[in-house]
Amino acid sequence: MGLGIAAPATAETPGSVTIGAQRWSAENLAVTRFRNGDAIPEVSDAGAWAAAGRAGRPAWIRYGNTATPAGWGVLYNFAAVTDPRGLCPAGFRVPDNRDWRQLEAALGGGKTAAASLKAATGWPTGVAGSNRSGFGALPAGFRTQQGAFFLGRRVAYFWSRDREANGTTIAHMLFDDDRPLFRIEYDVAMGMSVRCVAPA
């Protein structure tokens, strides 16, 4: 089982943790500019969020349009995730489905991997993880394609950068119970958390 080896944040790179052959950011991304310095629009209005998603325009927002717990980061739509200007810091990228599967396998798979990925605090009583990996996943919830917010403090949703043949993408989810890491197709106009990955 690949337990994580932590590295602190610097001015150039996020805090990270090495798990198996991968290096992952140790917190949800919270940048509001692309790597080239261009601003990513903050879109608080529900109608404007829906319009941005339909048009493929990048957007970000804090869960609930308000201050959130430390480590939650911000929620991005898929256009921000895949924008060629780059969402993750230099040397990192948004993971694809294979990266997520590799991470899960390095931690033993199934419920064991899920518990290792979840933070030891910040979840409802009795459902926190062990955080043995150092990944520290938190239940930052998601924003629907219509602009509503759901399941903050209950579920963690993470983007992958792959787009499916039917136009959707795959979300990777950790629940407020003992279920394993879960994958589900979601609309690209959703708002979800982002982690970044690099070779170890």
Regions found by a protein language model. Give the residues of each.
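N-terminal export signals
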Residues: 1-10
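Conserved positions within compact, well-structured domain cores
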Residues: 11-200
